[in-house]
């Protein structure tokens, strides 16, 4: 496919008048001295170009998207319409009096998320999951500083979400990793062995990135709190537990949620996202400002939090994402519980269908996702997990997350979400079985995949280390 620059040779987009425009009033330092080298195409050619680009992409509306730990569920299109209503298209610096509708929505979303998590206070400002993580860890850091305790360590299980170590490190903590037990859960003895007065918190995902529920979470909570430490809940996998349990019940002190995952706002390609952070009562004054409050007469932005960590983002978060998430919650109501039920059901169905054909390192009941391994295929025929992922692209399926979590060799992390019906799941099972059989009988066919995509094999190392981002003649 040609770039838009290559398509512009010999064409014009807009023909400007020949009349000279006086630009003498412009300062010399803002006047361009060289050609812009911008492409020029007709409107029709521009439309065709971007339509062609869109046809090269894969999206949830096109086919199955079982990207583990990403919750690529269907995003109701009516929510896009609601987020574009004129009343929400206001400047973030308008006064509270002129933003009552937007502030009311934010207040109601705060209340809804607090009810779902049973936490006590919340901020909507963080704009991504990892941003929420860092916000939560900054709250924990300031809490201990304010009570005069110099705690320097954060415990992170090897089954935690991938961005947890970076978030804790960027907040000034040292990382202490603990290994999982034979069931793929936090090893209590390993936790006890590293738990001392230097430990500020533990960061956990429950269910963890193996898709396994941490059945000893109450014991972990007791041990941490007896040590004066806090528990951080990464909400990456919250789609598995809505209506059945919640972070407060499990003993967590700080929670972040991914609205772009659990609450069905479009994501991928870098955003947009939202990672609200909720806390227990003793931490509410540490939240970033402002939070939205209500005095019985009007909604207002509250900056009066005496121990606040300050602002973590300009303005008040990714507002359009908040609108879509709130619309989703209203649409689903009590059926949020059924969303989790079906997500767990779909994952267990796939796991049972596929474990005969691929290794299953932790054969435990899973929640919303599960992790297979391509070790068998690699050992028998040299077909790696990466090759399996490439072959899936020929079956109108987005590859699952691969090589994560790191504790599973040749990992294949599959999350079907609640959106998919049995026929789609069966098609995926059939494709995965076919790949496993072909890997045995004709491995070269899998090793050379994909065969039907517009772009075949690419040099991923070259693309990552030396990206070519600029067009030149």
Describe the predicted segments one by one:
Residues 71, 128, 160, 208, ...:
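Short, flexible loop/turn elements at secondary-structure junctions
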């Amino acid at each position: 496919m040609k770039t838009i620059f290559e398509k512009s040779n010999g064409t014009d987009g807009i023909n400007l008048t020949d009349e000279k425009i006086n630009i003498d009033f412009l300062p010399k330092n803002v006047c361009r001295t060289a050609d812009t080298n911008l492409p020029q195409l007709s409107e029709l050619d521009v439309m065709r170009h971007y339509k062609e680009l869109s046809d090269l992409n894969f999206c949830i509306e096109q086919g199955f998207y079982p990207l583990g730990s990403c919750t690529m569920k269907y995003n109701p299109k009516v929510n896009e319409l609601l987020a574009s209503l004129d009343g929400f298209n206001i400047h973030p610096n308008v006064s509270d009096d002129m933003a009552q509708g937007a502030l009311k929505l934010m207040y109601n979303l705060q209340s809804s998320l607090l009810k779902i998590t049973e936490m006590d206070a919340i901020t909507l400002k963080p704009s991504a999951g990892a941003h929420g993580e860092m916000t939560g860890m900054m709250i924990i850091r300031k809490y201990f500083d304010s009570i005069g305790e110099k705690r320097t360590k954060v415990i992170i299980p090897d089954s935690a979400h991938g961005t947890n170590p970076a978030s804790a490190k960027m907040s000034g903590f040292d990382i202490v990793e603990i290994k999982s037990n034979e069931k793929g859960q936090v090893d209590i003895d390993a936790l006890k062995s590293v738990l001392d007065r230097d430990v500020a918190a533990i960061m956990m995902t429950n269910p963890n990135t193996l898709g396994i529920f941490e059945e000893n979470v109450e014991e972990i909570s007791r041990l941490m709190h007896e040590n004066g430490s806090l528990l951080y809940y990464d909400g990456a996998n919250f789609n598995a537990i809505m209506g059945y349990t919640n972070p407060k019940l499990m003993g967590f002190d700080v929670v972040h949620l991914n609205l772009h995952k659990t609450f069905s706002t479009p994501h991928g390609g870098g955003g947009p996202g939202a990672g609200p952070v909720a806390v227990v009562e003793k931490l509410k004054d540490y939240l970033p400002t402002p939070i939205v409050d209500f005095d019985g007469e009007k909604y207002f932005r509250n900056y009066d939090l005496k121990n606040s960590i300050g602002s973590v983002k300009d303005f008040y978060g990714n507002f359009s994402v908040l609108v879509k998430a709130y619309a989703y919650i209203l649409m689903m109501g009590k059926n949020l519980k059924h969303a989790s039920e079906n997500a767990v059901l779909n994952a267990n169905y796939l796991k049972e269908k596929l474990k005969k054909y691929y290794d299953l390192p932790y054969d435990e009941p899973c929640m919303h996702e599960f992790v297979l391994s391509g070790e068998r295929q690699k050992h028998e025929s040299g077909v790696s997990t990466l090759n399996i992922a490439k072959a899936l692209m020929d079956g109108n399926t987005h590859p699952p997350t691969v090589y994560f979590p790191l504790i599973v060799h040749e990992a294949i992390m599959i999350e079907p979400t609640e959106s998919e019906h049995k026929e789609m799941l069966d098609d995926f099972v059939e494709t995965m079985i076919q790949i496993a059989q072909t890997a045995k009988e004709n491995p070269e066919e899998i090793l050379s995949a994909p065969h039907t995509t517009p772009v075949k094999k690419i040099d991923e190392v070259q693309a990552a280390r030396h990206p070519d981002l600029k067009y030149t003649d």
